[in-house]
From Swiss-Prot:
PROSITE patterns: COA_CT_NTER. PANTHER family: ACETYL-COENZYME A CARBOXYLASE CARBOXYL TRANSFERASE SUBUNIT BETA, CHLOROPLASTIC. Its cofactor is Zn(2+). It comes from the Bacteria. The gene is accD. This is Acetyl-coenzyme A carboxylase carboxyl transferase subunit beta. A zinc finger (C4-type) spans 33-55. It comes from Prochlorococcus marinus (strain SARG / CCMP1375 / SS120). Belongs to the AccD/PCCB family. Pathway: Lipid metabolism; malonyl-CoA biosynthesis; malonyl-CoA from acetyl-CoA: step 1/1. HAMAP family: AcetylCoA_CT_beta. GO terms for cellular component: acetyl-CoA carboxylase complex.
Amino acid sequence: MSLFDWFAARRKDQFVGKVIQETEESDGLWGKCPECGQVVYRKDLLTNANVCSNCGHHSRINSEERIKLIVDQGSFIALDKNLAPIDPLGFKDRRAYADRLRESQASTGLKDGVTTGVCRVEEIPLALAVMDFRFMGGSMGSVVGEKITRLIEKATSKKLPLLIVCASGGARMQEGMLSLMQMAKISGALERHREANLLYMPLLTHPTTGGVTASFAMLGDLILAEPKALIGFAGRRVIEQTLREKLPENFQTAEYLLEHGFVDKIIPRTELRKTLGKLLRLHGFQKITIST
């Protein structure tokens, strides 16, 4: 294994989190919760939004499943569906960036790592962006930044509240500065949205790290999170080596950030739509007709 492969494997292991594993000879019908060890019927798990009914462990879900969970049925209208990334730097590490893109697109069915659109939540219009960690670790490249920026600008022009579901390892290194500049571009669009007196809520899911945490994930009027989500900038190991101190066991979890004032509310996945509806109504948003 090369040094690059070793670092890539360690980085992936840190962020992917625990998922429900199929039991032996289960034919995909049963799974085992990695948190409590409970054997669960996979159909029941899917019905419960991939949340263990025994211990409440939240396993990963993809962007399509997330959208179905949040929005009123049939209300989601996707935007910028055909916007796709290119390889502006001709970047190659142990594999070409163009090959990585093709592989992620084939395995996920997505053009890039975010889906954006307008929808309704409990009949209230909402601009929604959902990041998908399956696509190159949810990394933020120029297309992810452009789609989110365009969504924010539409939300501002249409006077819509905004929800961004974050799941990312950070900026996409294969695009260099073109990736890093998305942090400022999105932040600028969010400031114009704020100046229009509109509500922005990021939902931090596992994991939310790096340049995403350092920009739009922490700029919300209300910062929401899923239980036990990993949220941070640098990795735990790097911080401990820099400070030469042992960090608390729950460091960089949603619960730790809530306790220290960085997160406003932790929302179990099964209660998300209802809670979002309450928050939108609390901030004065009502049922209206929206157009794209």
